Regions:
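Short, solvent-exposed loop/turn segments at secondary-structure junctions
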Residues: 19-22, 56-57, 81, 91-94, ...
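Protein kinase-like catalytic core scaffold
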Residues: 13, 85-87, 182-184
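Active-site nucleotide/adenylate-binding loops and adjacent lid/helix of ATP-dependent enzymes
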Residues: 1-72, 77-80
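Generic recognition of flexible, low-complexity loop/linker segments
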Residues: 2, 60-63, 158-161, 170-173
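Well-ordered beta-strand positions
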Residues: 75, 175-176
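ATP-dependent carboxylate/phosphate-activation module, predominantly the ATP-grasp catalytic core
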Residues: 64-65, 69-155
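C-terminal active-site "lid" helix and adjoining low-complexity regulatory extension at the edge
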Residues: 130-158, 162-169, 176-212
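Short helix/loop capping segments that flank catalytic or ligand/cofactor-binding pockets
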Residues: 23-25, 59-61, 85, 97-99, ...
Length: 212
């Protein structure tokens, strides 16, 4: 299994700590630097708990921003009838960073739930910085960007939300590859800034009807 990991198609490995958040304590290394034995030594020496292959994202997302895997965040909420409601969708966009988290200085933009099109400019968590209509490095338009495989992404997330009814509200991190969407993780304590800043308004009323 370790050798298979070292031979993954991207040629890269992602090391993480188990309790990491916001892109902190993440390191990306070339798989060619390791053997099955040395990878364990490296993790123990540097206090890493997890290692996974670096995922190759969809070419359109690489064109938008090649420095990191640019994930989609979708917020789901189970209502009183155990039906899945979408609270919001965001495209995270890296800016010369190996991670895409807003807390690490990157961008996030609102996505239309129905079409999968980015419908507003991207913003930073630092509200003193200007919003971005185009990517500041690649100059690719952000507003109007079509997230690939959108209908498949929404269907996948809704199905997953129903599998975890004990967690009523989850912030899903989705990677879009050339073969379709896949899960990175689901967050029970999802970031309210990522939810509200791209919308440019408070969204508390969406939670109040669920008594949250």
């Amino acid at each position: 299994q370790t050798q298979k990991l070292l031979n993954n198609p991207s040629g890269k490995l992602v090391f993480k700590v188990a309790d990491g958040k916001c892109g902190v304590a993440v390191e990306i290394k070339n798989a060619s630097e390791f053997t099955p034995a040395s990878i364990v030594d490296f993790m123990e020496k540097n206090s890493f708990d997890l290692v996974e292959e670096f995922i190759i994202q969809h070419p359109k997302l690489t064109e938008l921003s090649p420095s990191a895997v640019n994930t989609v965040r979708i917020f789901t909420q189970l209502n009183a009838n155990n039906e899945v409601e979408i609270l919001g969708c965001r495209q995270r966009i890296s800016v010369n960073s190996s991670v895409d988290n807003m807390a690490a200085g990157n961008l996030a933009a609102p996505i239309d739930e129905v079409t999968g099109i980015v419908i507003g400019p991207a913003v930073y968590s630092d509200i003193t910085k200007p919003e971005e209509i185009n990517h500041p490095v690649t100059k690719i338009p952000i507003v109007g960007f079509q997230v690939p495989f959108w209908s498949e992404t929404i269907a996948m997330v809704k199905e997953a939300a129903l599998l975890h009814p004990q967690n009523r509200s989850i912030g899903w991190d989705i990677v879009i590859t050339e073969n379709g969407p896949g899960f990175i993780e689901g967050n029970h304590d999802w970031c309210k800034l990522l939810w509200q800043l791209p919308a440019k308004k408070g969204l508390k009323e969406l939670l109040e009807k669920h008594q949250l």
